[in-house]
Amino acid sequence: MRGISRLYWSLVLICFAFAPIVEASSVRLKELARIEGVRENSLFGYGLVVGLAGTGDTHRSKATLQSIANTLQQFGISLDSDEIASRNVAAVTLTAKLPPFANSGDMIDVNVSSMGDARSLVGGTLLLAPLKAVNGKIYAVAQGQVSVGGFSYDLNGNVVQKNHPTVGVIPSGASVERGLSTDLVGADGHINVILNQPDFTTASRIKNAINKTLGPGKARAVHAGKISVVAPAGEYDLVDYLTRIENSVIEPDRIATVVVNERTGTVVAGGDVTIDNVTISHGNIKVVISTDYQVSQPVFVREPGRGVSTVVVPDTSIDIEESVAEPVRLSSGASIADLVTALRQIKTSTRDVITILQLIKTAGALHAQLVIQ
């Protein structure tokens, strides 16, 4: 445990040692925002994976049997679902992302997930299946060999499994049949720039940078997450116009943030996070309750009466151990790294560090947004 604790504190100190490196610097607008209308669209579908070595859906998956019957019907073979018995087929759901500006003939990856009680999709092949958007229209068709990053083998009731063999992917397994139209210019004749992380200061700086690049009055900050830019009237090609916007240089502003992950005990903070004058005194109380059961056997001088019997008597003891709290004092302007170093010196546990950060935030001494995951 001592080695694990030493490793944890080493990692935390490394995080804070490099924190000043990630302070705000000048970046291009394309790293901070996107053009409205340029986005991915989700596609979904349903299909059958065939060629499984007895690891497909069982007869309990009625939807799979009906799907097999429907597929055979397309080839002129009429069978009732009750007449089908196969463990080499699995019903699957298909998901994919249609990228912006996709054209007919482009290939995209397809994720395949089992719907029924199949044990594995290893070695399976997806039959031709359509991929639809939320509007119900078909935008791509998928087919191909399923690649699974795991396996599952069952013999005489013994199962050996690695990762999730019921989920796979078909790289470049779907062909785009139609692309989605991308409207970069709105009905009002403006191009909207959407910030990845809305911030009023950053939005104002982006507006000023665009006006410096394109000319006064071209851009207007609508709110913290949106800047409206006048579309070119004809003197510029739209692509060249957007290129100039995307390559505008901005120094973004960001909120000082401390991120805490309670599950892993990780604490990450930027170099600009400071703490006011604060004194921390954190102690631990350990309560140990133990019970021993003693047998009470009465001594008889003569014949025992009716109310005399052997009984079990519990003997309970409570021990309380309180460790002496060692105070930690930090002066105004101290950083989170200073706090972690001070807590390391008094051998504070990971859980206590998280608790102390929460209390400092409650006391108003932590000038940062505390995010607990």
UniProtKB/Swiss-Prot annotation:
Family: Belongs to the FlgI family.
Function according to Swiss-Prot or TrEMBL: Assembles around the rod to form the L-ring and probably protects the motor/basal body from shearing forces during rotation.
Location relative to the cell: Periplasm; Bacterial flagellum basal body
Single annotated GO MF: structural molecule activity
HAMAP family: FlgI
InterPro entries reported in the protein's UniProt record: Flag_FlgI
Source lineage: Bacteria, Pseudomonadati, Pseudomonadota, Gammaproteobacteria, Oceanospirillales
GO biological process: bacterial-type flagellum-dependent cell motility
An example Gene Ontology CC term for this record: bacterial-type flagellum basal body, distal rod, P ring
Oligomeric and partner information: The basal body constitutes a major portion of the flagellar organelle and consists of four rings (L,P,S, and M) mounted on a central rod.
Protein name: Flagellar P-ring protein 1
Signal peptide region: 1-24
Keyword tags: Bacterial flagellum, Periplasm, Signal
